[in-house]
């Protein structure tokens, strides 16, 4: 693929994604936007009071659950409040203010797509492979849905993509000044996104020191660069946790205070001490993750995988089984080919690439473990959005699989190789349009 065609396709995909997500954010009904009403309490409070909530105010506390999302990082709410304040200068329409608040998620999703293209350009020699990564990430139905309403998930994926991008650049430059600044910024933003993305903070530390030792950098340089990354991350993200600790008696993460608040103010059946969990019921691994609980239509595994692909509203608007199977087949085939053709030559033969692969895999594994742990011990949730921090690495590997397969074609098939590499992307876009037009729009934007 020549450079002109690549950039034309790239910018059209970015523009198309923005138009789809922004357009959907205008018409998406609030009752089909999970937890949005509870999250909207924070930017509404900021706009009304011109100050940040501490999380214990009644006006930001959910009457049923008894706690507030203001106890957890809420940078997205602060950004939304800025958009709402600007919009309020022109109109007081509730619909316009809601659309303004949703713009944070729209821009987070668009930003993710831009960064994923940059990741593809750094990782792959062929431009069509970079294009494929963006298609796989940006046009997954669930990711588009998350980019249309007020939540922390799309912003968390954006920060993860940013961190991975600077991992790759740092792998090539031994973390030059620009890459240290970029990694620090990514980590600081990630800290203010969602706890399920924190695996990338841990892996950033491990990868940074592993690469610096591999490049045999002097101890002084390692210390100075590590300090720079930490300082930038702390300047961006540290304020919230210090504020939490001061206000809530040392509770940096807000989790203890959240439980105490829920115990005091939640409806009886939602108080932490009364909440039934697989752990309190003594369920086995099989009962928790593989068997279908009473009152549910599918087990944890299927529900999580299907809602990672696309399950809208409060997981009540589903795609037909054939679409889940087609998406699953596309992903499974690409990943299997990656394991056999792409993993060893592209990721295992040079130590920096191996270290990058290990950290990406570890981050995905920790993300999965955290979700499974929370499901068993805290709150049974079979939602694919909790695994969204694994989206970018997973799709990059699937892309690598398809690219490795077409790279095996004979030299005289070079032109066909480009089209065949993009074929899975074309199929993916067709499946997305079917999912979007046939199910997301009727189920969440037009339903009464």
Where would I find each of the regions flagged by the language model?
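Transmembrane-helix motifs of polytopic, lipid-linked glycan transferases
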Residues: 99-124, 162
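Membrane-lumen/periplasm interface segments of specific transmembrane helices
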Residues: 224-338, 435-442
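Membrane-interface alpha helices of multi-pass inner-membrane proteins
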Residues: 179-195
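Loop-to-helix entry region of an early transmembrane alpha helix in multi-pass inner-membrane enzymes
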Residues: 70, 74-78, 89-111
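Transmembrane signal-anchor helices characteristic of membrane glycosylation enzymes that use polyprenol
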Residues: 5-36, 44-53, 64, 229-246, ...
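Short helix- or helix-capping micro-motifs
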Residues: 17, 133-138, 187-191
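Start-transfer (signal-anchor) and selected internal transmembrane alpha helices
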Residues: 1-23, 212-213, 222-232, 347-360, ...
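Perimembrane helix-loop-helix junctions
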Residues: 169-172, 200-234, 246-247
């Amino acid at each position: 693929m020549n450079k002109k065609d690549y950039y034309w396709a790239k910018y059209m995909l970015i523009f198309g994604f923005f138009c789809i997500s922004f357009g959907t954010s205008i018409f998406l009904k609030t009752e089909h936007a999970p937890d949005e009403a509870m999250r909207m309490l924070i930017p509404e409070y900021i706009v009304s009071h011109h100050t940040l909530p501490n999380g214990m105010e009644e006006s930001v506390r959910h009457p049923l659950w008894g706690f507030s999302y203001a106890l957890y990082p809420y940078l997205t709410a602060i950004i939304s409040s800025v958009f709402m304040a600007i919009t309020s200068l022109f109109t007081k329409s509730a619909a316009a203010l809601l659309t303004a608040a949703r713009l944070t998620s729209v821009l987070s999703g668009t930003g993710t797509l831009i960064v994923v293209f940059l990741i593809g350009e750094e990782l792959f020699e062929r431009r069509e492979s970079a294009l494929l990564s963006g298609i796989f990430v940006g046009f997954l139905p669930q990711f588009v849905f998350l980019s249309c309403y007020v939540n922390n998930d799309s912003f968390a994926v954006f920060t993860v993509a940013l961190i991975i991008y600077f991992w790759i650049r740092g792998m090539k430059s031994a973390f030059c000044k620009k890459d240290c600044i970029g990694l620090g910024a990514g980590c600081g933003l990630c800290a203010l996104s969602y706890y399920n993305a924190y695996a990338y903070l841990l892996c950033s530390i491990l990868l940074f020191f592993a690469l610096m030792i591999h490049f045999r950098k002097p101890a002084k340089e390692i210390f100075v660069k590590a300090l720079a990354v930490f300082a930038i991350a702390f300047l961006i993200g540290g304020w919230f946790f210090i504020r939490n600790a001061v206000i809530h008696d040392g509770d940096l993460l807000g989790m203890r205070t959240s439980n105490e608040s829920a115990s005091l103010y939640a409806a009886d059946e939602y108080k932490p001490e009364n909440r039934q969990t697989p752990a309190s019921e003594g369920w086995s691994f099989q009962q928790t993750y593989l068997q279908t609980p009473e009152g549910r239509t599918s087990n944890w595994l299927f529900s999580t995988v299907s809602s990672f692909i696309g399950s809208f509203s409060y997981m009540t608007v589903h795609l037909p089984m054939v679409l889940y199977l087609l998406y699953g087949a596309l992903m499974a085939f690409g990943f299997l080919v990656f394991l056999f053709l792409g993993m060893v030559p592209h990721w295992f033969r040079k130590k920096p690439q191996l270290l990058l692969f290990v950290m990406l895999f570890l981050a995905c594994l920790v993300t999965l473990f955290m979700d499974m742990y929370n499901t068993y011990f805290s709150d049974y949730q079979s939602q694919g959005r909790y695994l969204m921090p694994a989206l970018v690495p997973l799709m990059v590997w699937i892309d690598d699989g398809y690219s490795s397969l077409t790279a095996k074609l004979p030299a005289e098939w070079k032109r066909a190789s480009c089209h065949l590499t993009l074929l899975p992307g074309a199929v993916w876009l067709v499946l997305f349009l079917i999912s979007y037009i046939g199910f997301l729009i009727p189920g969440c934007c037009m339903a009464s």
